[in-house]
Amino acid sequence: MLGVGPGDEVIVPAYTYTATASVVHHVGAKIVMVDVAPDSFETDYDRIADAITERTKVVMPVDLGGVMCNYERVFAAVESKRELFRPANDIQKAFGRVIVLADAAHAFGARWHNRMCGEVADFTSFSFHAVKNASS
């Protein structure tokens, strides 16, 4: 849907379930992992901006253990590198910057700054695997 494919890069956290990175591999894009912050399980938000290149199309923050990411910092990182963004299709052109696609499988029902998960990122994915908060 977002037109990500070979030659593109997608930033994912190093601390996540394999499915987050696997979807990037399945479309032929390059997986770019960003490490966690010291003494934390959260992505090191300062490193997100450092990882963005002209090939970056998506940043995939992962909400963990019912706690949503600091989306203010994620969007700040994306905005700080807006000039590097090279859209490849109409959806990407409409955003004019790297797209934020949240993996909120572990945050179903969580809130961040009075906004429900699913309302904060540009797009949000949920999983219904047996070990997730909402299983099928």
What do these predicted regions represent?
Residues 3-104, 111:
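PLP-dependent aminotransferase-like
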Residues 91-135:
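Conserved active-site segment immediately N-terminal to the catalytic lysine
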